[in-house]
């Protein structure tokens, strides 16, 4: 454990009952005295740093620290503790619930996107990654320096911090697992300002907690990831599905889940269903060449009575770019401010029994397809006997969804509005989720915090995000952060003592 080699002090201790204005003044003075760089209020930079990814959920921070060093992070945490404001790390700022801004007004935001260095050890192939690096920058550096990679999502602007600490699924996950599975150690600033290393051998309880619920226990100042050799070829593909009526949805989905459960999807294949009101497709990225893809996918095509509508072979970075939906990949500019207005929900489920599948299909056709906003549903082929995600032992970290049968599909339900989000919009996705969960045992479904749903209350959110791991997480929270310095509305609660 490394204690901060400096002290910080506000002019006066600010009580918990002090006004927001008094706390802002106190945190400003404390950060100034500690020489922590900050974002000036009412500046253009403040507008960017305080902007949410979800425009539906803007919040006003008490202050924004923009550290350039680990010592700055430590000092910022100590200032928050002394003044009595909650602190939240913000890596890329893509939280669907604006948790990087605190999920409410009045928090200290520790804006990490100025700390984005990535280095690769040429002998061990371990990547050292600062917490503000975005996925596109990481992918670019690892490939350019050594043709290496680790498994992560497809959006280049997403920050590594929240993404990897809470899962991190993408088009290499069926082959290589989640981003969280590639973390070998991390340097973490705790609520008392100390800097500790967490790994299998150092602070193992913290390391376990970080790998699935990391934002609750501290601010990661540096990650170390193992990497794999990027394959020389990957192949993107699309298959149009005739899911235009509920019977076709039931038939096609049923065939797909049987194929997945029975080991038909090889490890090299990564796949999702992408559906909206206008079309439904299977999309994916095969880790191999086009010829190998066509051979591997032929049994599924026969089951679905379908054909490949698109096949493109790429090198690794071209494959990443294909599904990035972004012209820019190597993003390091702190001025990056992509945003949308939306509501989103998630699910992780087992295979769907016939009655649930029929209810979900009916909702899709009769309700969802009549909604004329820009909604979509993504159904990721997540589990099954060949999935690297569910091959990880359940106790390896606090990430909860590792059963190859009970955790077969990962869903993102996303409803975007191009104006103010309508008051009746929430019922649309809530109803769709209920169509799934109404017929499933609670052990057969959960939710994924990287698609956070702010409509859940705190107790429900903790339960569906962490399931069997919640009690242990609460005990570790009590040990490391009993006063909940690292708080947001769905944060893990400390265990009662």
UniProtKB/Swiss-Prot annotation:
Optimum pH is 7. Its EC number is 1.1.3.-. Keywords: Disulfide bond, FAD, Flavoprotein, Glycoprotein, Nucleotide-binding, Oxidoreductase, Secreted, Signal. Substrate binds at residues 154, 272, 412, 451. It is an enzyme of class 1 (oxidoreductase). One of its GO terms (cellular component) is extracellular region. Residues 1-16 form the signal peptide. It catalyses: D-xylobiose + O2 = D-xylobiono-1,5-lactone + H2O2; D-xylotriose + O2 = D-xylotriono-1,5-lactone + H2O2; D-xylotetraose + O2 = D-xylotetraono-1,5-lactone + H2O2. Binds 1 FAD per subunit in a bicovalent manner. There is a cross-link at residues 94-155 (6-(S-cysteinyl)-8alpha-(pros-histidyl)-FAD (His-Cys)). Optimum temperature is 30 degrees Celsius. Stable up to 60 degrees Celsius. GO terms for molecular function: FAD binding; oxidoreductase activity. The keyword Nucleotide-binding applies. The keyword Transferase does not apply. It is found in: Secreted. Catalyzes the selective oxidation of C1 hydroxyl moieties on mono-, oligo- and polysaccharides with concomitant reduction of molecular oxygen to hydrogen peroxide. This results in the formation of the corresponding lactones, which typically undergo spontaneous hydrolysis. Xylooligosaccharide oxidase is able to oxidize a variety of substrates including D-xylose, D-cellobiose, lactose and arabinose. The enzyme acts primarily on xylooligosaccharides, indicating that it prefers pentose-based oligosaccharides over hexose-based oligosaccharides. PANTHER family: BINDING OXIDOREDUCTASE, PUTATIVE (AFU_ORTHOLOGUE AFUA_1G17690)-RELATED (PTHR42973), FAD-BINDING PCMH-TYPE DOMAIN-CONTAINING PROTEIN (PTHR42973:SF39). Belongs to the oxygen-dependent FAD-linked oxidoreductase family. This is Xylooligosaccharide oxidase. The gene is xylO.
């Amino acid at each position: 454990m490394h204690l901060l080699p400096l002290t910080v002090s506000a002019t006066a201790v600010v009580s918990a009952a002090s006004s927001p204005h008094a706390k802002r003044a106190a945190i400003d003075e404390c950060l100034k005295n500690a020489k922590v760089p900050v974002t000036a209020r009412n500046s253009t930079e403040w507008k960017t740093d305080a902007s949410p990814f979800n425009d539906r959920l803007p919040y006003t921070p008490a202050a924004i620290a923009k550290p350039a060093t680990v010592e700055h992070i430590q000092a910022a945490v100590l200032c928050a503790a002394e003044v009595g404001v909650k602190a939240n790390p913000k890596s890329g700022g893509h939280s669907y619930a604006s948790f990087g801004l605190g999920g409410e007004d009045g928090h200290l935001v520790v804006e990490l996107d100025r700390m984005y260095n990535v280095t690769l050890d040429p002998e061990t192939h371990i990547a050292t990654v600062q917490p503000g690096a975005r996925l596109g920058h990481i992918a670019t550096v690892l490939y350019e320096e050594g043709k290496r990679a680790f498994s992560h999502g497809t959006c280049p602007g997403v920050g590594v911090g929240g993404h990897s600490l809470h899962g991190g699924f993408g088009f290499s996950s069926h082959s290589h697992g989640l981003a969280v599975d590639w973390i070998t150690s991390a340097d973490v600033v705790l609520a008392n300002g100390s800097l500790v290393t967490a790994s299998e051998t150092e602070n193992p309880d913290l390391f376990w907690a970080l790998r699935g619920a990391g934002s609750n226990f501290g601010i990661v100042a540096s990650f170390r990831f193992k990497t794999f050799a990027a394959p020389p070829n990957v192949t993107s593909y699309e298959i149009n599905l005739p899911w235009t009526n509920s019977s076709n949805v039931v038939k096609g989905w049923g065939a797909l889940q049987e194929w997945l459960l029975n080991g038909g999807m090889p490890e090299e294949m990564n796949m999702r269903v992408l559906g909206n009101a206008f079309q439904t497709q299977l999309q994916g990225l095969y880790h191999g060449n086009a010829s190998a893809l066509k051979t591997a996918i032929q049994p599924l095509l026969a089951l679905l009575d379908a054909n490949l509508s698109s096949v493109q072979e790429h090198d690794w970075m071209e494959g990443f770019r294909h599904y990035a939906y972004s012209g820019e990949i190597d993003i390091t500019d702190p001025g990056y401010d992509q945003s949308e207005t939306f509501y989103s929900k998630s699910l992780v489920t087992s295979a769907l029994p016939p009655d649930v599948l029929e209810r979900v299909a009916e909702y899709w056709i009769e309700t969802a397809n009549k909604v004329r906003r820009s909604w979509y549903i993504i159904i990721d082929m997540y589990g099954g006997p060949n999935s690297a995600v569910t091959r990880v032992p359940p106790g390896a970290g606090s990430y909860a969804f590792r059963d190859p049968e009970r955790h077969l599909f990962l869903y993102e339900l996303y409803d975007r509005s191009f104006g103010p989000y309508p008051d009746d919009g929430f019922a649309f996705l809530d109803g769709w989720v209920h169509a799934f969960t109404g017929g499933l045992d609670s052990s057969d479904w959960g939710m994924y915090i990287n698609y956070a749903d702010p409509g859940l209350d705190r107790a429900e959110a903790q339960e569906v995000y962490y399931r069997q791991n919640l009690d242990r997480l609460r005990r570790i929270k009590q040990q490391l952060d009993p006063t909940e310095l690292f708080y947001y509305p769905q944060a893990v609660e400390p265990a009662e003592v």
